[in-house]
Amino acid sequence: MTHKQSINVIGAGLAGSEAAWQIAKRGGHVRLYEMRPVKQTPAHHTDKFAELVCSNSLRGNSLANAVGVLKEEMRHLDSVIIKAADEAAVPAGGALAVDRHDFAGKVTEYVKGHPNVTVVQEEVTEIPEGPAIIATGPLTSEALAEQLKAFSGEEYLYFYDAAAPIIDAETIDRDKVYLKSRYDKGEAAYLNCPMTEEEFDRFYQALIEAETVPLREFEKDIFFEGCMPIEVMASRGKKTMLFGPLKPVGLEDPKTGKRPFAVVQLRQDNSSGTLYNMVGFQTHLKWGPQKEVIRMIPGLENADIVRYGVMHRNTFLNSPNLLKPTYQSKKRSDLFFAGQMTGVEGYVESAAAGLVAGINAFKWTQSQELAVFPEETMIGSMAAYITNANAKTFQPMNANFGLVPPLNVRIKAKKERYEALAKRALESIQNFMKEV
């Protein structure tokens, strides 16, 4: 049976605009709800769709980086967000940066101007009946957030990111770290970076002097959510971390048989073991200082940080428990979620989630099989990550090559390896396009 009704898309940000576009261009009818300017958020200032509230950069445009590959995949699928960004681009070296007013204006013009899109400017306070995509973003209104909490279960909806940095496993110096669990309980599941007292002192001093990201007004209470940044912990006294995430007890170094002065633990972050996260290292440091401090840790001197630690206001779901790789709710087949609230991190990633949700919401109305993008693609690897990650430790993730399955052939040089991964991803998306 084909479901003929319109699809309600809630939120005209990057994800909602992309979702509406993908539905409309396939012949589906969309009712696109946007509460601005009737009700503004603390971060937005206009009534335009896809308003960029932070940076005007959509990050790297080269196929040598993951987000560049993601953009190229989206170009293949006629993404309205990437189309508008390309048209509104300003000089930015190897990155794709935009004139933010021109960009938002173009997205608004394309989406509003499509004959299959009806725009409704009002706040949505309940999850709508019938086919719908919720794409209300990190600043979801309080009324709808309460409804989402009731729908998903209070323990599965979060209001703040507190993400520790994630490291590319290939860049960890295995000669300096060792595999062990505390007191040897269970399997040896952690990589341990041991520190001498002298190494710890240098690390501690750099950490407390490192520059942090200024908090915005609506983020002032962020640290009272039971999650303390590592630098705030350090500022409370030199030994505080030694009784917290850097506690060495039960982690004797097998090479020496002795207990180090301090230990930084790394925990495997994905099933293929290509990514490791830094246990207890949620941080509000700026990215430059964050990299410098992390590279002072033994074994991480040459670490590639695929996702930096962040702490900010962000309404997001525990997607491993709630969503399928199609961005479809496990609980309600006609309900989809898109954008940053699904646990993808970044402008482009949010739009990509909207693209998949839009395609699949339309397919649902046509009683067609929903599209699960190949994991070799950046689009598919993100969908796989947010739905298959460990639900207990789930935190938002941006596009990176550590998410895709390894190549069949080992390529040691990073540049050549990334080029091969990009080539495979784009070949895969081209083969997959006929299904979407």
From Swiss-Prot:
Signal peptide as annotated in the record: none
Pfam families (alphabetical): GIDA
Keywords: Cytoplasm, FAD, Flavoprotein, Methyltransferase, NAD, NADP, Transferase, tRNA processing
GO BP, sorted A to Z: tRNA methylation; tRNA wobble uridine modification
Predominant location: cytoplasm
Top-level taxon of origin: Bacteria
Keyword Plastid: no
Entry's Gene Ontology cellular component terms: cytosol
Annotated transmembrane regions: none
Cross-referenced InterPro entries: FAD/NAD-bd_sf, MnmG-rel, MnmG-rel_CS, MnmG_N, TrmFO
Subcellular localization(s) per the UniProt record: Cytoplasm
Record: residues binding FAD: 11-16
EC number(s) per entry: 2.1.1.74
Cofactor(s) this protein cannot do without: FAD
Gene3D superfamilies cross-referenced by the UniProt entry: FAD/NAD(P)-binding domain (3.50.50.60)
SUPFAM superfamilies the record matches: FAD/NAD(P)-binding domain
Catalytic activity annotation: uridine(54) in tRNA + (6R)-5,10-methylene-5,6,7,8-tetrahydrofolate + NADH + H(+) = 5-methyluridine(54) in tRNA + (6S)-5,6,7,8-tetrahydrofolate + NAD(+); uridine(54) in tRNA + (6R)-5,10-methylene-5,6,7,8-tetrahydrofolate + NADPH + H(+) = 5-methyluridine(54) in tRNA + (6S)-5,6,7,8-tetrahydrofolate + NADP(+)
GO MF annotation list: flavin adenine dinucleotide binding; tRNA (uracil(54)-C5)-methyltransferase activity, 5,10-methylenetetrahydrofolate-dependent
Enzyme class: transferase
NCBIfam families for the chain: gid_trmFO (TIGR00137), PRK05335.1 (NF003739)
Similarity section: Belongs to the MnmG family. TrmFO subfamily.
Protein's job: Catalyzes the folate-dependent formation of 5-methyl-uridine at position 54 (M-5-U54) in all tRNAs.
Name by which UniProt lists this protein: Methylenetetrahydrofolate--tRNA-(uracil-5-)-methyltransferase TrmFO
Originating species: Shouchella clausii (strain KSM-K16)
